[in-house]
Amino acid sequence: NNFRFINDFDDEEFIYWIEVNSRKSNSKLVATPLKIDSELQKNLYINLKQIIFTSATIAIGSNFSYFKESIGLEEDTLDKVIHSPFDYDKQMKVYIPDDIPNPSDRDFVDEISEFLKALLIKSRGKTFVLFTSYSALNYVYYLLRDEANGIELFIHGMAPRTHLVNMYVNGRNPVLFGTDSFWEGVDIKGKQLSSVIIVKLPFKVPSDPVTEAIIENITAQGKNSFIEYQI
């Protein structure tokens, strides 16, 4: 039944694609719901009397409407914003350099490498450098690893995630080059992490089947997919 359902490709509420694994010489037919609200209603909410969602990122400003709509919650569902105990205006600064090439330029990664080298030396490490591309991550890491005097460099993949975080915490003037899982869910207390450098904003690849289908659906409704979804 599952094979017939996927093979028919005729349910507009689902996204279909084929994944090819060249190493194992096989392929997968994949189907996933375009929207998950009805699936959650049928398979989760109906079985529960109460449910609590908590996260640092489910509200936009102090508005939960986007989150509620996307997972099938009623607009009058109770919500609450618990404000941060940190005084961000006094405890942090955000810098956006205006003299770095566009990420699509061929010189971008080389320019970023020089910029990072100067910044990491000045800050004496204690930094996460977050990438959206493994190729850029590896290129910059191997370019800088022999020039970062007195700074201990760690790269995503050199050890399991938890072990790598522990290595960073116990490192001397550490810098961690990471992607994917290091963008969220990592908590480094104290002065061992004093800066986070985002090399490029983590927009999803437009050619990803799920992303592409969601963008097409939003556009078909006459809405701006960049504002409504990607940002």
Feature locations, PLM:
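ASCE RecA-like P-loop NTPase motor cores
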Residues: 1-231
